[in-house]
């Protein structure tokens, strides 16, 4: 009895293994002449042949195997050919622009009764809001008002009572006090009128942060100082055209 010739092909890790099975020897007493001729010779063992798939046939074989192991949508992703995906748009840049810093805005007032230094900083957050920071250092006595005003605000002297009213009226510009800190004490120094004597003066340090939003596009700092022997009104506006992508044209 003879067994038919068989051939098995299977794929392991991208390589093709080919196993060929020859005819089995028949039972003793077989009358096959070919069997009699080769009876005295040992039957050669067919070696197991291993070969690689040709580049043309590899994608087909790989896709057949991967189709059984992975979902249809992931076949080409495993083969190194990812499917087309929509390109993600880059995130919008949220760069913070410093309109002017501590060294760009300051007001220094020195009188017989008062020594005052005010510094400020404005930061544009790029999302329609900006912050205004103030630092105040004063020795002596005097009344000072710091307000946020539009560029059209006229620089003029007012009565002392109107200064604080204007400071409260700045709320109409969508600005609010976000943080404030005040420290008070006494400081001794040489008397101004008589350097041979030592005088004690009131000393105050304060910091404040205001948060503003649109439509308050351009902000100016308005300082008004009144004392018995000195008066000062000052308006400081940043160079908005230098820091902004769109030009600003003031009106009024």
Swiss-Prot record:
One of its GO terms (cellular component) is extracellular region. Its main location: secreted. May be proteolytically processed at the boundary between the N-terminal non-conserved and the central conserved domain in neuron-like cells. Residues 45-55 have a biased composition (Basic residues). Keywords: Glycoprotein, Secreted, Signal. Highest level in brain, present also in lung, kidney and testis. It comes from the Eukaryota. Residues 1-22 form the signal peptide. The keyword Secreted applies. GO terms for molecular function: signaling receptor binding. Residues 167-252 are annotated as: V (Cys-rich). Residues 27-59 are annotated as: Disordered. It is found in: Secreted. Residues 158-166 are annotated as: IV (linker domain). Residues 76-157 are annotated as: III. May be signaling molecules that resemble neuropeptides. Ligand for alpha-neurexins. Belongs to the neurexophilin family. This is Neurexophilin-3. It comes from Mus musculus (Mouse). The gene is Nxph3.
């Amino acid at each position: 009895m003879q067994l038919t010739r068989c051939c098995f092909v299977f794929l392991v890790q991208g390589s093709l293994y080919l196993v060929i099975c020859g005819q089995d020897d028949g039972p003793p007493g077989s009358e096959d002449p070919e069997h009699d001729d080769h009876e005295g010779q040992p039957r050669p063992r067919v070696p197991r042949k291993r070969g690689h798939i040709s580049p043309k046939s590899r994608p087909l074989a790989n896709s057949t195997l991967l189709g059984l192991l992975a979902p249809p949508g992931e076949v080409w992703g495993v083969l190194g050919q990812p499917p087309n995906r929509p390109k993600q748009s880059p995130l919008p840049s949220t760069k913070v622009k410093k309109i002017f810093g501590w060294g760009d805005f300051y007001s220094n007032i020195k009188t017989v009764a008062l020594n005052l230094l005010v510094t400020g900083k404005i930061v544009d957050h790029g999302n329609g809001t900006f912050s205004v920071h103030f630092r105040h250092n004063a020795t002596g006595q005097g009344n000072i008002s710091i307000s946020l005003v539009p560029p059209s605000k006229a620089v003029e002297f007012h009565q002392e009572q109107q200064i604080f009213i204007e400071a409260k009226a700045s709320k109409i510009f969508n600005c609010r006090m976000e943080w404030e800190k005040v420290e008070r004490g006494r400081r001794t120094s040489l008397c101004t009128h008589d350097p041979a004597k030592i005088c004690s003066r009131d000393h105050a340090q304060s910091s404040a942060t205001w948060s503003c939003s649109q439509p308050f596009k351009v902000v100016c700092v308005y300082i008004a100082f009144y004392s018995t022997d000195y008066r000062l009104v000052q308006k400081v506006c940043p160079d908005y055209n230098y820091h902004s992508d769109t030009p600003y044209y003031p009106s009024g």
